[in-house]
Structure formats: C-alpha cells, structure tokens
Swiss-Prot record:
Localization of this protein: Cytoplasm
Name of the protein: 33 kDa chaperonin
Gene symbol of the encoding locus: hslO
GO annotations of cellular component type: cytoplasm
HAMAP family: HslO
Broad class of the protein's primary localization: cytoplasm
Keyword field contains Disulfide bond: yes
Post-translational modification, as annotated: Under oxidizing conditions two disulfide bonds are formed involving the reactive cysteines. Under reducing conditions zinc is bound to the reactive cysteines and the protein is inactive.
Source organism of this protein record: Bacillus mycoides (strain KBAB4) (Bacillus weihenstephanensis)
One Pfam family here: HSP33
Lineage summary: Bacteria, Bacillati, Bacillota, Bacilli, Bacillales
Domain of life: Bacteria
GO biological process: protein refolding
Amino acid sequence: MKDYLVKALAFNGEVRAYSVRTTNTVSEAQKRHDTWRTASAALGRSLTAGTMMGAMLKGEQKLTIKVEGNGPIGPILVDAHANGDVRGYVTNPHVDFEGTEQGKLRVYQAVGTEGFVTVIKDIGMREPFIGQSPIVSGELGEDFTYYFAVSEQTPSSVGVGVLVNGDDSVLAAGGFILQIMPGAQEETISFIEERLQQIPPVSQLIEQGLSPEELLYEVLGEDKVKVLETMDVQFNCTCSRERIESVLISLGKAELEQIRAEEEETEVHCHFCNERHKFAKEDITSLIEKL
C-alpha cells in the first residue's frame, strides 16, 4: 500500500482532521540513515507529524521542525512541504533501548524529557513564523499536541506511531491530528476525549491494515467524517548535484581555488538524505571557469 494523507472535517465542521500512512516514508528514512529501533521510532514519529503539519500549508510553503531534547539521540530535524514531500534525520541514529512500555518503544529515553520543539514556517513572507514550546514527555505525540496549544493556540490531539521489527526495519507508521475548531460543542470534545482513551496505539491500527480514512473512522466514527482531499506523501530530498554546485560557486573563486589546491576530491554530505556528492579537481576547475 502506498503512503498517502487525508484531509477531513468531522462533526459538521467542529473538528479538522488529518490522517496519514507513512510506512514507506519512514522505512526509506530508516534505510538511508541506518537508524536503530528506538531512533527509528523517534524519527518516524517526527516525520509523520511533520508530514501532516506540512499538509496544513499551501503552494510552495514549507516548514522545518527541530526537536532538541536532552536524550542521547540528539536533535531531530524534519523538513516538510505542502506538496507531501518530507525529509529528516536524527543526529545520533544508533540509539536503542531494550524492552517496551505498554507495547511501545521507549522513545522518551532517546529524545529526553527536557528541551524544546521548534517549528519554523516559510510561508512566503519576509520573515518566517517561528513557534516554540517545551518538551513535555519526550514521546513526541504529546509534545506536538502541546506545541499546537502553546504556539498556535489550537486545541489539538496528535497521535503518531511507528512499529519496528527486530532487524530494525519499519513494519508500520502513521498518525493523525485532530483540531478543535472555535465554537465546537462540549459534547463533541468529550466524545473525542473518550475515544482517544479507548483506541489501540496508532501503529497497531496501521499494522492491522487500516487506511488513513479508516483510522479517522476508528477515532471519530465513520458517519461523522467528511473526507475533503487525499494526497500522496513521500520521503524526498531537495538536494541535488546541481544545487550543490550552486552552493560551491557561491563560495567564490578564491575559496574554490584553495579547495582545488588542498583536496584531491571534495565531498559534500547531505544530512537529510545521507547522500554524498563527490567533486574531483576537474569538477572544481569547471566551476571556477563559470565565475
């Protein structure tokens, strides 16, 4: 099954909802970065949340999420675009903790329970929107829920999950974001709160084969949900040899000549996708000739 995202309304517009399957997306990230189990869960949850938050944007808009906790995994960075493209990495991919709690990996031990979630939105204005909130649990779903409440004043529930096999491969990943609209009735809010207490973990529902639509039906009730739009999502990095050439050219002639004199081969590493772009002396020479 391919990865895709659903945008919906529920309870006659009282609730805005997003749901996504990110199994292939998170699996691609796991393979590229060789993340171990707990690191895979942390990165996967962040990618899943970022994918849905990116889908809240329009056109060429994009956002960057930075999760900086005090755990051994180090900072997590995610870039997400309005078109469904997402990329991301963890600073220390080889982090794992044995055992589980309530059937889930101990993500909070990897992320840490102190620190900040920062979201930078590039929405085409002169200055980006920057929102920040403290980490409240390190489990990430709760941390993004708190971010929406504190930084965007939007009562929300963020559920994100990743199931990882013993060989570190990704079995299932996905999530949902529910946002309460102004004027929502107390009965609606109470119903959602009760349902969220009753449903199994998101990753288990996706492993069972539930689609993004069915995930929303499970939480909100099929008769309450009106699907507005679906869109494909995927791990896709914006780095390319051409873009890196532009960056190298921007260094200027003097610095490029110094690089050519000192290095037999220049390697540029993209942290987001882990690709390594190599430039031989003659490649640097051709760049200098363009100046």
